[in-house]
């Protein structure tokens, strides 16, 4: 049984063949595959962001890999946040097997093995180039959102940054910020008279929030040399975009660190990149796997900042794709900014799952060819319901799609393969060694050390003056008391005498038959 020709005609109209696009796959309708790789995302619309969602094991990571490698092939640099370590294989060519051959045949795709230029990055420096950023580059507003500070605490942090700017104190890492806070809440408090001052309670909150961030590994992230975001925009000698892979297996239980880096990176790109508006191809595309780690437990201020950056960075030619199990993992404000949807199968085992399924189905455009809710539960592995923004900015009707196989390896590099690539990477060597140049912490320590000798000299001078001073003279006309008189006048002598007297009087009164009255109880 052949696929309904009306479905194919509608797909050809939605995805015209003359458009430069990222090929996704062939249309599927009532279990029949169209045999033509028609469905794709226009390259000029990749900066309109997207969502890749679906239950575990439905093929989300392979879809991510498929889109990323085609972007690289078109000269577009790519950034991948790899939580599970599944996509490092993009750096080497895939191997054909029966499943690959069958999928290529079903979709009418001419599959060829290929690897792509890749660089590996790390927030801990263990499996890639060490990523770092300075506290100064964050600035007080962004850092306040990361630390989840209230308005008063945020204003104090801004005050501290202003003070450091005025005094030439560099804030490179968290130890610099801690040193300044401790100084200004102690011996340097007088320096703040022109800035408004700050309470020790507020300083305590800031220090505690910093400790919490450090416990997630931020002490490794803040510092120098700072990662140059231009390294994410590299194109290889043969014109292919570089795929930068951030290995996150060792920090997947530290979402605050991941969120901190992501927000800094997007905000810095937005600040540094020029406005380009609508372009033929994006300047850079991000893929954030396991996106719920970014949004889980994030503060309202941080979510607002992420939503704002995602909304605005489109005009810089940068696209952002989130990969997660369910659309409900992404806040509605962010979800509304995602123009492309590649929705793999959803499972409805519980009432909550059923509710999420209905909500996901309602977000798709209307279509006369599919029952969207039923289709979402019947998709096979490597199939997805796809709707994208056309070059005119209008969402296409959703089409069930059988995805083509990636041309790179569908699996991670071995440890030996990864180490070989790291050892030959100039980028890894560039960021391998931390730089600890003079900054606020060292400058304040030097200032305290310079003040210490002055204090010692002052103390020595006081001692010398006391030694030179003449001894006090005895009062005229009266000889000094003898040693015996001094002993009798001492407090101890008076105490001993009183004890002896009370003992003698007690014995005398007892012999006369007189009882001593009990002492009165003190009333309070």
Where are the predicted features?
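Conserved ATP-driven motor cores of ASCE-family P-loop NTPases powering translocation/secretion/packaging/pilus
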Residues: 2-3, 66-68, 91-110, 308-394
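Generic beta-strand/beta-sheet core signal
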Residues: 44, 53-55, 81, 121-123, ...
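Flexible loop/turn segments at secondary-structure boundaries
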Residues: 48, 59, 86-88, 127-129, ...
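P-loop NTPase motor domains
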Residues: 68-78, 85-308, 334, 378-379, ...
